[in-house]
C-alpha cells in the first residue's frame, strides 16, 4: 500500500498579500494587463514551489485564482450573463461579473458553505451555450510542469456542486442542465489526462448534504463522464462535514479515489466506514489536519485515527491531506514572534500544516519512532496551553454558572416595546439609516498607522477621529438620514476592534485570509476565556451623540459573528465561547444605555454561515446562537431599541431564528441577491422592524433613486410600512466618499417618495 502526502489548496494572497496588492493596482490602472499577468504568474508559481519544498507529493494546481474559483469555473463553462456581452476581453468580462461595472450590477456573492469565504454565484440564463470556453486547469498544469518540473494535481470544482451553487434555473430544468455539463467536463478531463496529469481532484463539498435522489443523480453524471474518460485518475473530494448518510452509494461512484474530512466529519465518516468498509480498488484520501483553524494538530490523535482506519480499510493507497483547502488559514506563523511563547507554539498556519502532513507520512511509513522528538514536543505544547491561566478563569466560570432563564429574554413583547420606542425616538414612517461604517479613506488608514507606529500621540489620534466623526455626522444631517452612526473610523475591523478590548483574545501581525475578491481579513485568535475589561465603544458613540439632536446608534458586533469570524480555541464547545462573548457584550450594552444611547445595533452578519451543513444539526446550533444574542441584548429597558444586521445568507433557512432573536429592527442584505429575501417574505410573515437593503455596497456603481425606490416598493408588498426601515445592504467602509454621498442622497429621496405615496394612498 502506497502512502502519499497531498494538499487540497493553498492560500492565494501571498505572504505579504502580494496578490491583493497586484489586483488592486490593476483595478486602479496603476499597472497594465501585462504586468498584472506577469506578477500573478510569479505568485502562483511561488506557491507551488513552497509546497514542493515542504515535501508535498500531490501539489494542487488550478486552486489559484484572480478572484474566486467558482467564478473561474463559471467563466470556463460559459456561464456568462448576457448583460456583460459588451465586454470582449477575458479580464474585462471576468472582473465585471465579480465587481459590476458603471452600468451593470455584479453577479451575486454569497458564503462558501459555512466558511467566511465568499464566492461569486454562477448565473444560468435561457439559451446559454454551455461549453468548455477555456481549459484553464490544463494551462496551469502545463505551466507548473514546464516552469518548475512539478507534475501537479489539477483541482476543479465538480459539476454537481457547481450547478447546485448556481442560480437562474427551475428545479425542473436542473437535470437537463446537469447533463449539458457532461460534455465540457469530459473535454476538460480528457485534455488533462492526455497531458499527463497523475491525478485530478474533483471537489464536491455539496455531497455532505445531499438527498438520496440527488446522490443518484450525481452518480449518473459521473458514470457518463467516466464512460468517456475511462483512464483518468479522478479523486472525488468531499469536505466540511461527513458523507455518512450517503456513504454507501458514494463509494460506488466510478472514481479512482475518495477524499473524506476526518476533522469536521470524523464521527460520521468513521461510522460509515465501520458499517460499509471502503473499496479495496480505490484510494482513500484522509483529511486529518484541520484546514479551517490555526492550531497544531494533536499528532497522537491523528495517528490513532490511522490505526483505526488501517484496521477497517484494506485499500489500494492512502493519501494524507488537510480536511479542506488551506485557503481558510494564514500562510506562515514565523512572523508572529510577538505572541506569547505558549500561544506561538500552539499555532500552525498553512506552511506548518504542510509540515505536519509530512510528519504524519513519516510516522506511517517509517514508524512513530522516526518522529519521537516531534511527538514529545507536540505533547508538551498541548499540555502548556491547556493548563494556562488564560483558559482557566474562575470569574468567567462563575458568571456562566450564575445565568438564569430570565437573562435570555426582554421584559415586554415586541409590539409593546416598539410603541414605547416610537414615543421615545420620534422617528418618521420608513426611517432611514446606514449599517454603521463610513469610508476608511487613505488618510484614515495612514493616520491609524502613524498612531500605531508612535509617529503621532494618542491625543493627536483621538482629535483626528473626532474630526472625522463630526464631518460625517454633518454629512448625515445634510443628507437627511433619520438615525445616524458615528462612522467607526477608530475600527480596523468589526471583530478585531472588540477582540483587542476583551480578555481571551490575541492578534497576529500577518495572519491574513481571503474573505472575498481582494478583501482580506485578519481574524482574531480566541485562545483563552473571554471577559469584559473596560468600555469599548462608549467614548466615540457618546461624542457623536453630543454633536447632533438626531438619534445616534451604538454599534457592536454580536457574539456569534465574533465567534464565527475568529480562530477559536478547540478545547471547549463553541457554544461556551459564544456565551462568554455574549456576557462581555451585555456589560458594554448596559454601559451604552446608561450613557444615553437609545438605539444599539448588535450585528450578526455571520449567524447563518456558522450553521452546520446538515439540516439535522441545525436546531442545536440555532438554539445556542439565538440564546447568545439574547444573552447579550436582553438586559436593556423596553424603550431602548435593539437593532441587528445580517448579510450574504440563505435566509429562508433561518427566518424562524431571525424572529427568535427578538431584535426590534433587523436590516438584511437584499439588493445583491436580486430580491430573494423579498420572495421568502411572500411565503412567511415577519412582524418586527425590518430594513431590506436597497443597494449593493460591494460595487463601486452609484445606484439611481429609481432603482432603490423599486426595491422599497417590492419590500412594502411583503412588509408592514409601520415597521419598515430603509438602509444600504452593508457598512460603507470600503467605498469612497464620492460614491457614498450621492448613493445615500438617492436612498433618502427614495424614502421620501415612498412616504409620499403611502400618505396619498392612506
From Swiss-Prot:
Identify the residues that bind 5-methyltetrahydropteroyltri-L-glutamate: 17-20, 111, 519-520, 565, 609
According to UniProt, the reaction catalysed is: 5-methyltetrahydropteroyltri-L-glutamate + L-homocysteine = tetrahydropteroyltri-L-glutamate + L-methionine
Q: What is its EC number?
A: 2.1.1.14
Top-tier EC class: transferase
Q: Name one Pfam family in it.
A: Meth_synt_1
Would I find Nucleotide-binding among this entry's keywords? no
Annotated residues that bind L-homocysteine are located at: 435-437, 488, 603
Give UniProt keywords alphabetically: Amino-acid biosynthesis, Metal-binding, Methionine biosynthesis, Methyltransferase, Repeat, Transferase, Zinc
| UniProt remark on cofactor binding | Binds 1 zinc ion per subunit.
- Highest taxon, organism lineage: Bacteria
In alphabetical order, the GO MF annotations are: 5-methyltetrahydropteroyltriglutamate-homocysteine S-methyltransferase activity; zinc ion binding
Q: In which pathway does it act?
A: Amino-acid biosynthesis; L-methionine biosynthesis via de novo pathway; L-methionine from L-homocysteine (MetE route): step 1/1
Binding residues annotated for L-methionine, in chain numbering: 435-437, 488, 603
Query: Which Gene3D superfamilies does the entry link to?
Result: 3.20.20.210
Q: Which cofactors, by name?
A: Zn(2+)
Specify which residues bind Zn(2+) according to the UniProt entry for this protein: 645, 647, 669, 730
Tell me the active site. 698 (proton donor)
Which is a GO BP term held by this UniProt record?
A: methylation
Q: Which family does it belong to?
A: Belongs to the vitamin-B12 independent methionine synthase family.
Matching NCBIfam families, A to Z?
A: met_syn_B12ind (TIGR01371), PRK05222.1 (NF003556)
Q: Briefly state the protein's biological role.
A: Catalyzes the transfer of a methyl group from 5-methyltetrahydrofolate to homocysteine resulting in methionine formation.
HAMAP family, per the entry:
Meth_synth
Descriptive protein name: 5-methyltetrahydropteroyltriglutamate--homocysteine methyltransferase
- Organism of this sequence: Bacillus cereus (strain ATCC 14579 / DSM 31 / CCUG 7414 / JCM 2152 / NBRC 15305 / NCIMB 9373 / NCTC 2599 / NRRL B-3711)
UniProt lists the gene as metE
